[in-house]
């Protein structure tokens, strides 16, 4: 599984510590993060253009905005640790940057879970040329 995530990073440029973020998504949604979210809508994976297609796509938009607030933390590559307490994700605090990156990923994974009922398979592999217009501001 770890090798699959490393390959995914190289191929599609998924942001963040892909291993931890992918694990969070899997735990929260019971969906394969690579196949279910990497190409979803206009804001998941590569992209960030146009209006989010639905609530799940908005989760990705907000996640990108969260990372944009942490440019000095290298959120695309900085690994972190987290654990669970009573089923809830708890971010470790080894450094402020790692904690903030983890909190961005935690919020996105929870957002995906909260919007599972409106997950739309037609956006699962959405062609990015359909994403038109300027993206709203964070």
From Swiss-Prot:
Residue ranges of the region described as Important for membrane-damaging activities in eukaryotes and bacteria: 121-133
GO MF: calcium ion binding; calcium-dependent phospholipase A2 activity; phospholipid binding; toxin activity
Disulfide feature: 42-131, 44-60, 59-111, 65-138, 66-104, 73-97, 91-102
Cell compartments where the protein resides: Secreted
One BP annotation, GO: negative regulation of T cell proliferation
Signal peptide start and end residues: 1-16
Keywords: Disulfide bond, Myotoxin, Neurotoxin, Presynaptic neurotoxin, Secreted, Signal, Toxin
The keyword rRNA-binding belongs to this UniProt entry's keyword annotation: no
This protein's GO CC annotations: extracellular region
Gene3D superfamilies in UniProt: Phospholipase A2 domain (1.20.90.10)
InterPro entries: PLipase_A2, PLipase_A2_Asp_AS, PLipase_A2_dom, PLipase_A2_dom_sf, PLipase_A2_His_AS
Pfam families associated with the record: Phospholip_A2_1
Function: Snake venom phospholipase A2 homolog that lacks enzymatic activity. Is very active in inducing myonecrosis in vivo and shows a potent calcium-independent membrane-damaging activity in vitro, most probably by binding and incorporating in the membrane. Also acts as a presynaptic neurotoxin. A model of myotoxic mechanism has been proposed: an apo Lys49-PLA2 is activated by the entrance of a hydrophobic molecule (e.g. fatty acid) at the hydrophobic channel of the protein leading to a reorientation of a monomer.
Protein name: Basic phospholipase A2 homolog ammodytin L
Species per Swiss-Prot/TrEMBL record: Vipera ammodytes ammodytes
